[in-house]
């Protein structure tokens, strides 16, 4: 019974999550847009900062990060200037 309640809560939160946020795809992972300098084994990204302007699409997101000398990434969890579990946004070069 507890499993069903936890599973239902998980599904409900996934459905309530954003369906695309500032150049990053929606869903449970990779929803936080960051501009990062270094990628370590696609697990952690270092020297990250949050975009200072709205980045509604990948082109603007990529150009904004490039102006800082960084790469655009969509992360699951930003921690102390690092991004964890990050991916390139769909369509980024």
Swiss-Prot record:
Matching Gene3D superfamilies:
Hydrophobin
Organism for this UniProt entry: Trichoderma harzianum (Hypocrea lixii)
**Where is this chain's protein located in or outside the cell?**
Cell membrane
Q: Which residues form a coiled coil?
A: none
Q: Which InterPro entries match?
A: Cerato-ulmin_hydrophobin (IPR010636), Hydrophobin_sf (IPR036686)
Q: Which cysteines are joined by disulfide bonds?
A: 24-74, 35-65, 36-48, 75-86
Its protein name is Class II hydrophobin 1
Q: What keywords appear on the UniProt entry?
A: Cell membrane, Disulfide bond, Membrane, Signal
UniProt function note:
Aerial growth, conidiation, and dispersal of filamentous fungi in the environment rely upon a capability of their secreting small amphipathic proteins called hydrophobins (HPBs) with low sequence identity. Class I can self-assemble into an outermost layer of rodlet bundles on aerial cell surfaces, conferring cellular hydrophobicity that supports fungal growth, development and dispersal; whereas Class II form highly ordered films at water-air interfaces through intermolecular interactions but contribute nothing to the rodlet structure.
Its GO CC terms?
extracellular region
Q: Which residues form the signal peptide?
A: 1-16
Q: What does the annotation say about its assembly with partners?
A: Interacts with maize ubiquilin 1-like (UBL) protein. Homotetramer. Further self-assembles to form highly ordered films at water-air interfaces through intermolecular interactions.
UniProt similarity note? Belongs to the cerato-ulmin hydrophobin family.
């Amino acid at each position: 019974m507890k499993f069903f309640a936890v599973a239902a809560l998980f599904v409900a939160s996934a459905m309530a999550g954003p369906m695309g946020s500032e150049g990053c795809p929606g869903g449970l992972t990779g929803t936080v847009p960051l501009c990062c300098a270094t990628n370590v084994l696609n697990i952690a990204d270092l020297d990250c900062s949050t975009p200072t302007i709205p980045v509604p699409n990948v082109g603007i997101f990529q150009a904004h990060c490039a102006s800082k000398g960084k790469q655009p990434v969509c992360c699951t969890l930003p921690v102390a200037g690092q991004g964890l579990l990050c991916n390139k946004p769909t369509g980024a070069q």
